[in-house]
Amino acid sequence: VINAPEQSSLDDLNLNQRAYEEIKHIKDTDQITIQVVNIGLPQKKAGVGLARKIGLDEAARWFKKLNHSGILVCFDGDCRCNDTYLAAIYNAYKNQNLNAGILAYEHPLDLESGIIPYELGLRYYTDGLRYSGYPSVHQTLGSCITINSDHYCKHGGMNTKKAGEDFYFLNKIVRKPGFA
């Protein structure tokens, strides 16, 4: 999902259009099919949560239409991964009784960007949950979510909150069987 609030600057809209054109060039190869959605979001609801919901809902609908369960993977435009990322996710689902999970992540540590305090805060959050004895410790980064499409539909999909949507979504599924 390539998205921007409806009242975005012309520069942002042009950047999105260029991204859309680039993705069209790589879509539908023999190994992967990509459905691209380029959409303006209502200003009041615009945010990564709504974009994530649109993408997940569309992918789940596509799998249902094919009468096939598939793997949904969240990934943000500013993320990076290695060449084996998708294969590792596929193998995890193939080799385990997996319905959903949180993928490992690591931000590139640029000393100038302030990412170190952010990364430490993320770790502090899960360490605090662990220390408190919370039964289901998990990170709440939306870009790290993966879920089986049938499981996604069964549990009502992503919500439309403008902030914290990944937190609330994960809390619905984290205690269900097959979460890793």
Which residue ranges define each predicted feature?
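Catalytic donor-sugar/metal-binding loop of nucleotide-sugar-dependent glycosyltransferases
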Residues: 161, 173-180
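Acidic donor-binding segment of Leloir-type glycosyltransferases
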Residues: 1-44
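Alpha-helix termini
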Residues: 24-30, 58-69, 176
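Acidic donor-binding loop at a coil-to-helix junction in glycosyltransferase catalytic cores
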Residues: 161-168
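Glycine-rich, basic loop-to-helix element that forms the pyrophosphate-binding segment
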Residues: 41-64
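Acidic donor-binding/catalytic loop of UDP-sugar-dependent glycosyltransferases
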Residues: 66-69, 75-92
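Conserved donor NDP-sugar-binding/catalytic core segment of glycosyltransferases
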Residues: 84-117
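A recurrent flexible, glycine/aromatic-enriched loop bordering the glycosyltransferase active site
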Residues: 126-146
